[in-house]
Design a protein with these regions (language model features):
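Active-site proximal loop and beta-alpha junction motif in alpha/beta enzyme cores
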Residues: 1-66, 73-115
Length: 115
């Protein structure tokens, strides 16, 4: 599934987020003509209706610890297909991002850390 939330994201559900070879997959996916301008790649698994394990490989950067736009893309997609409720937490290697949908608005909350 792809989503546009200010920047493009390819979202792929996998069985084991931690062991999936994201770097190799990202190189292969970005070679496709449909992604000629680059794309951020999210791999994920829904743990429960409230928790989503995820990792991200951002175009031009590589794998990062977390991604706000990626979390929004995942949340909106999974909410649309009724896999999560109106509140969910995306669990990235770098920390948790809390997402909610209230009165036709999306909210994203998380800790900011400078690296």
């Amino acid at each position: 599934m792809t989503s546009e939330v200010g920047n493009p994201h390819l979202m792929v559900e996998v069985e084991d987020v931690e062991t999936f070879d994201l770097d190799t997959f990202a190189v292969t996916a970005r070679e496709l003509d449909i992604f000629s301008n680059g794309i951020n790649i999210e791999i994920f698994s829904v743990v429960e209706r409230k928790f989503i394990n995820a990792r991200v490989n951002e175009r031009g950067v590589g794998e990062t610890d977390a991604c706000g736009s990626g979390a929004l893309a995942l949340f909106t997609y999974l909410r649309e297909i009724n896999e999560v409720d109106d509140q969910a937490i995306v669990l990235y290697p770098g920390g948790e991002l809390e997402l909610s949908y209230e009165k036709d608005k999306l909210f994203l909350k998380g800790k900011v850390t400078y690296l």
